[in-house]
């Protein structure tokens, strides 16, 4: 016997979270809980403002429609990426397809003072990998900060993300301030320039490896082995169903590319599922999931070792 519940939620964010020139004051989303007999599965649907093609309201409408169809015996999935991902996660938990084992390591995310990152990394066991957002300030400053971090921590590897912020000139200004001897320890720089061709040229000219992120969601993108391209960053909330995520990971691995499962600032429930997906599909690759510190609360399932308060299901608004 099938049954389902849908919850709506809103989590206050820390004051300094800015996405594409918009301050993100709250993170809004939905949960779906599917039951079939004794089994239960959860999924999170939380479109990311400025990045997702669908709004939270559109996702809610699509989710409620899909849940009603599922209750009637339908086996299909919704079209909207965030809804398809959340629904497929709930189904994968329900059927036991999604393994319980998780990779709760996370590449620390540096969003402010680089000194804070140095302190965090000093206590980090094993390989030291961190992520730094670039392109928010002057390119020269970004280059100096990256150089400082690589100089201060000789065994550090950095993942950088520019979100297509730079012109070719700005990208070159950044590279000029990174010691050529350190550039091999830049694991990759996500989408440095506004166009793929400019990003490819940047990789060739500087020797700094790049990764595709936004490009994966463009209609003309194809997976290819290219000079200077080292990785793809897969954000399941923006990608679609678990099957689509698996297809992208497999396509990347077939070409020798690193595939990194990455957060779209999901709640703790969604992040713990992404940690399980990473352990399942990209074992041995550190996922990019260090975004919980941007929020003021956890929900339903806490992240292991995190001290933020965790809300229970009866504290959320139920829609169904």
Curated annotation (Swiss-Prot):
Keyword annotations of the record: Lyase, Magnesium, Menaquinone biosynthesis, Metal-binding
Pfam family, one: MenC_N
GO terms for MF: magnesium ion binding; O-succinylbenzoate synthase activity
Active site positions, chain numbering: 133 (proton donor), 235 (proton acceptor)
Residues annotated as binding Mg(2+): 161, 190, 213
Pathway: Quinol/quinone metabolism; 1,4-dihydroxy-2-naphthoate biosynthesis; 1,4-dihydroxy-2-naphthoate from chorismate: step 4/7; Quinol/quinone metabolism; menaquinone biosynthesis
Cofactor or coenzyme needed: a divalent metal cation
Claim: Lyase is one of the keywords in the record: yes
SUPFAM superfamilies in UniProt: Enolase C-terminal domain-like (SSF51604), Enolase N-terminal domain-like (SSF54826)
Coiled coil ranges: none
The protein's Enzyme Commission number: 4.2.1.113
Protein name: o-succinylbenzoate synthase
